[in-house]
Amino acid sequence: MRYLFFLMVGVLASHAAAQSPKPAAENAKPIQDNSFLLEEAYNQEAAVVQHISALIFDRTIHTWLYAFTDEWPVNGQRHQLSVTIPLQNSVVGKSAALGDVALNYRLQLVGSGETRLAVAPRLTLLFPTAAKEIGRGNGGLGFQGALASSYMATPTLALHSNAGITVQPSVETGVGGSAALTDFNVGQSAIWLIHPRLNLMLEGMLTNAESFTGVGTNRTRSTGITVAPGFRWAYNFPSGLQIVPGLAFPIGFSANSGQRGVFLYLSFEHEMPGLRK
């Protein structure tokens, strides 16, 4: 489930812009946020916060990973902070436990959810809150950098591109020492806005992960591919609250071959008047 953990952190770390409260006449505006395996390049709008729950279950090996993310804008839309708290059951026979908590900062570098092109880099600090001795976590701090871009190819087709790197400087080797591991990921998605409140989604992610071979600090690399068809829909309320459920079916190829998952998603977005300047 290691590939699932980094996918979840990468996506939920800085997920997407919320739809701020709008008059009823504007409620039909197409949703742009709430991807699953990728992130869009839209920060939260000023004074709008987002609470995200995501659960992925691998039907082949009967493991699951849950993650809760809270996103908050900082003095407007340009800066955003968020925290991701994962709960995982990644080792057969072990009970669920806390994973490595992620603290994230993202900059709205170019554009926004209102422009055709948007770009947003992200920095993430992974805290070693997981228990290594029960098969979770890596025993040390981790760092993640990512770049997301979003492009509206047509009024009903959104394209999102991601690239990222995760560095873990001090991972326990299992033979009394530690060494660094580095992972890379790239991703692409296409979102079809078939209705103002219903989107069809096709997401793909390639992850190149480094691991120890089991003999000292010798390393090996594996490349896994995940493709996930899915859909999402939105409920908009007069108060400005937006609820977005979603469902996808991740399929693994290459190093992830044989993995078949079910991805459940639920987001709540609303305004916090106290954050208004």
Predicted feature descriptions by range:
Residues 13-15:
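N-terminal signal peptide c-region/cleavage motif recognized by signal peptidases
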Residues 6-10:
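Small-residue packing motifs within transmembrane alpha-helices
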Residues 19-277:
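Transmembrane beta-barrel domains of Gram-negative outer membranes and organellar outer membranes
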Residues 1-4:
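Positively charged n-region of N-terminal signal peptides that target proteins for export
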